[in-house]
Design a protein with these regions (language model features):
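Catalytic cores of nucleotide-sugar-dependent glycosyltransferases that transfer UDP/GDP/TDP-activated
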Residues: 1-491
């Protein structure tokens, strides 16, 4: 099968969030399963220094907002990506400082709607083999609002590739004024709320993808159900319920990059291990090296007392307020230590830093993000804390399972789909992989942490729990096979 994967970011070329991680791994997994794949993304200024073997393939003109834009399409390759990359080069839209969506002052680029609408038009031309590339896909997979117009534009063609639109985060709807809709000369039949892309007198590029793709996917089965409820749908529950009822909204779990996140080979840790070899000793050694980062006394570093780690954004969505509520009591009532790595709301940063000053041998804080430290925490902590209020898929709990660090998670989205709660029944059945609480409250979080710390003292049970998690398959190959089964059903 020939697959065109359209995205606004891809690791390691350009990254602002989880979409880049998916784009950097999933298309490669299709390729390794013997499919012909091309990835297309905008040629941002920062991308040029990360690609090699650049060759111009074609030129074309795209009309939008009363002007004609000259477009060059380049082929390129990049370390870490195995498939051909097609860069859509429109200097006046994409050669800018800042990140793909924000100017240097942190505000959205004023013309983001035009930028990504034009990019989507180019993708549609490529898909229809009208871009001078002499290649036409059987299927186009587009991602989030930035490429939401691609499936819509392709519905205007009598014979076309099939389309799959993947939602990574419903929070970003790609809302733009009616004047952009008019400037793009889109069909007026689309300017209505039920089957079109109008949303409270704006156009929504996210809604365009949801309405008009042949199939809609999102990044976990539970999130696919959750986004049909108002609290997760941001006003789009009507169209999402319809797509779900049609059988056209499907959740497929993300995978993890096992070249980057693998305790057998991780370059950021000194003591490697696997589910069956060296796990107990290596985890203890990695724990000591992790604690040594904070220059703690030797007696604290050498202690077997449990360490609970957290790596993530310090924002309400991630449940950090719940963590702050329960930490003082847990410090008083248990022997656990807590390591927090992240950045976010200044108030959360302040309160966590205050706790670290108050309990310097029990609470260790790193404000910021460090790739090296994130790996060390996954390998060195005994438990990983992820109390997110909502989480479309989540990656850190998958890393934790892979590293034998049982996660404590709130039952939402991908967290529900990936962590098997350590109930009596699941422990007896040998299925448990972590700890789940079902109400995002301080009481539920605290009691779950206490349950986890109790099980930590039962070494045989704990080692079985670790091993169960490490034996789960969260590879991109597994994810890709599920996507490909969907693709084959509609092509």
């Amino acid at each position: 099968m020939k697959i065109l994967f359209a995205t606004s970011e891809a690791h390691p070329l350009i990254k602002t969030g989880g979409l880049a991680d998916v784009s950097g791994s999933l298309p490669d997994a299709y390729y390794h399963l013997k499919h012909k794949v091309r990835m297309v993304l905008p040629a941002y200024g920062d991308v040029w220094e990360k690609v090699s073997d650049v060759k111009q393939l074609s030129e074309l003109s795209i009309g939008a907002c009363g002007r004609k834009l000259h477009v060059r399409i380049h082929a390129a390759s990049a370390e870490g990506i195995d498939i051909p990359i097609w860069l859509v080069d429109i200097p006046e839209l994409f050669h800018r400082p800042g990140n793909p969506y924000l100017a240097l002052d942190g505000k959205d680029w004023w013309d983001n709607g035009e930028r990504f609408a034009v990019f989507s038009k180019v993708v549609a031309e490529i898909a229809m083999n009208r871009a001078g590339l002499k290649w036409q896909p059987d299927l186009v997979q587009s991602n989030d609002w930035q490429t939401g117009l691609v499936p819509a534009l392709l519905t205007l063609e009598s014979v076309r590739p099939k389309t799959v639109f993947t939602i990574h985060n419903m929070a970003y709807a790609g809302l733009f004024p009616k004047s952009l809709f008019e400037g793009l000369e889109l069909p007026w039949k689309w300017w209505e709320p039920d089957r079109g892309i109008e949303f409270y007198n704006n156009m929504s590029m996210l809604k365009a993808g949801i309405q008009m793709a042949d199939r809609v996917t999102t990044v976990s089965p539970s999130y696919a159900k959750e986004i049909t409820f108002p609290e997760y749908a941001y006003g789009l529950e009507g169209v999402l319920i319809r797509r779900l009822d049609e059988g056209h909204l499907i959740g497929i779990l993300n995978g993890i990059d096992q070249d980057l996140w693998n305790p057998k080979t991780d370059p950021f840790i000194d003591h490697h291990y696997s589910a069956d070899k060296g796990r107990v000793v290596a985890k203890k050694r990695n724990k000591k090296e992790m604690l040594d980062f904070w220059d703690l006394p030797k007696s604290v570093i050498d202690s077997d007392d449990p360490v609970v780690g957290l790596v993530g954004r310090l924002v309400p969505q991630k449940g950090i307020d719940l963590v702050l509520d329960v930490l003082p009591e847990l410090i008083e009532q248990t022997n656990a230590r807590f390591i927090m790595v992240g950045t976010g709301d200044s108030l959360f940063e302040y309160h966590l830093t205050e706790l670290a000053h108050q309990y310097p041998q029990r609470v260790m804080i790193y404000i910021g993000y460090s790739e090296s430290l994130a790996h060390k925490v996954e390998a060195g902590a005994d438990l990983f804390l992820m109390p997110s209020r909502f989480e479309p898929c989540g990656l850190n709990q998958l890393y934790s399972l892979a590293y034998g660090t049982p996660p404590i998670v709130h039952s939402t989205g991908g967290l529900s789909d990936t962590v098997v709660n350590a109930t009596k029944e699941n422990l007896v059945a040998g299925k448990a992989t972590g700890f789940v609480f079902y109400d995002p409250s301080r009481h539920a979080l605290k009691s779950t942490i206490l349950h986890a710390l109790h099980l930590f003292s039962k070494k045989r049970t704990w080692q079985k729990l670790q091993k169960n998690g490490m034996q789960q398959d969260f590879s991109w190959t597994r994810s890709a096979k599920q996507y490909l089964a969907l693709f084959k059903a509609i092509v």
